[in-house]
Amino acid sequence: MERLRGPSPLENTTARHPAPLGPAHRDGLEPGTADRVWDVCVIGSGASGAVAADRLVRQGLDVLMVEEGFRLAPHVGLDEAESLSRQALARDGEGNWTDEGWPWTTSNLGGGTVYYGGASFRYRPFDFDPGELVHTDGVDVRWPYTLADLVPYYEVLERRLGVCGGDAPGIHRGSRHSRGPAHQPSPAARVLRAAGESLGYRPFPTPLAINRDPHGGRAACARDSLCVSHLCPTGAKGDVVAVFLAPLAAHPNFALRTGVRALRLEQDRSGEVAAVRCLDRQTGQAHRVRARVYVVACNAIQSAALLLRSRTPYSPDGVGNHSHLVGRGLCMKLSEYLSGTVDADPAVLADPYTNTGPFSTVAFLDHYLDPDCPGGFGGLIYESKRDQRHKLVHDALELRIETILADHPNLDNRVGLSTHLDEDGMPAVVIDYTPDPRDLDRLRYMTGRCERLLRTAGARGIRSRSTGFAQGSSHLHGTCRAGHDPARSVVDAWGRVHSADNVYIVDGSFMPYPGGLNPTLTIQAHALRTSRAIASHLAADRAAHV
């Protein structure tokens, strides 16, 4: 079988941080790893895995976290980080297969959070039960729990991450306010806000996990760089390395092992997993890691691929794939950028901070539920500053916005495994995704609303740019769907795999419906909810055997 060339860890030593994060961190697995049984093995160090590990460690459990990537050196920008990440087979815009699919944002310690913009929206009530407007064949889009069940976890995380900024007017009345004051709007955001208000919109500050003021032992944002292009130089952004993993790295009952890829889950009997087979990517040696519980937090593409690779005599189609739904129902969210320019005060154009700092400081949800939109529901519009990989406009102020909207779950959109092998000898990941025509109609409607907003702001030279969402995305959902019925879902309401009692999934895989907002905070809230349940279960089990 043909091998797809991927990055070798030994070729990328300049991108790796020369120092460990703390005493609990090292690259690779030491000899004798198989001799120990951990309370919990967390697979993946990104948005959800770090939250789960933090809760489990602080509940007194012995936790091993394995992460395929490495800790990045401070100078590594998004371009270089992307070049270190393994790609996947995917369809291009014409429907042809290419090897340029994106099965993650970046592959490194902290995952995509080290380059995300910090957008931290709470989902809306509609997102938990959209069935009145979202009609799909053979797919249950109702979540197995409600927004009210998740609100306490949102509140904890907003305080921990230092989320700053408000919410859409009238949303979540009655829940405690757990956010700090909003960041100052950018010059572009002020123009967009005024234009939106003239259209009858209700703009609000984009909620951001970025310190406006010092918080949690981390500095305030210095606006030194654009958050989506570079690692945060001050620690102000609430990426999971700064907020969760760095403090954990000094904890005696936590072990963080980077450069370790989870190849497959192994079973000695039906109904549970006995070990995870891991590859030390520096030495090329395989190790068997044992734990009482396994928390899978790789993202909605990589977690599905791990389960599909985990074929055993007890799970011949892959662990958790009893319903043949693992990998199916992949949702990416549709999105598009629109931009234009307006005249501005020369002092604003000369200000070096005009195009740095938070990527978004104003948002609009006036078309989230919109009877004029095809299907009756639209999505989000928000400021989205251009990252520094693209030429900035120096003789005018650029207004750049993005619209994001949920896609209809479709079982034919799926993650699969190829006959081609990757550089580690594993089946390459296949992303088979085709947008629903109904969603493309909704996207056209929303881009029209974006163009109207820009024209109202006086923008000229308006142009649009695709985000390439169909080939992969930083918003990944739905491949290990949650539900009460094991025949129609992969995991239960707590993220536990129906057919493997000691395996939990805490990333966006669990989402029955992707929601129309940036999902990171919601994924983290689910991870916190699930990890608290795991800790309670293990404590009860331990007490029963004393």
From Swiss-Prot:
Q: In which pathway does it act?
A: Antibiotic biosynthesis; lividomycin biosynthesis
The answer on whether this UniProt entry bears the keyword Oxidoreductase reads yes
Q: Which residues form the active site?
A: 475
Q: Has keyword Flavoprotein?
A: yes
- What EC number(s) has UniProt assigned to this enzyme? 1.1.3.-
Question: At the top level of its lineage, which domain of life is listed?
Answer: Bacteria
Q: Name one GO molecular function term.
A: oxidoreductase activity, acting on the CH-OH group of donors, oxygen as acceptor
Query: What are the UniProt keywords, alphabetically?
Result: Antibiotic biosynthesis, FAD, Flavoprotein, Oxidoreductase
Q: Name one Pfam family in it.
A: GMC_oxred_N
Q: Where is this region: Disordered?
A: 1-30
Q: Name one GO biological process term.
A: antibiotic biosynthetic process
Q: Which cofactor does it need?
A: FAD
What the record says about family reads: Belongs to the GMC oxidoreductase family.
- Name the job this protein performs: Glucosaminyl-6'-oxidase involved in the biosynthetic pathway of lividomycin by mediating FAD-dependent dehydrogenation of 6'''-hydroxyparomomycin to paromomycin.
Name this protein carries in UniProt: 6'''-hydroxyparomomycin C oxidase
User: Taxonomic classification, please?
Assistant: Bacteria, Bacillati, Actinomycetota, Actinomycetes, Kitasatosporales
Gene from which this protein is expressed: livQ
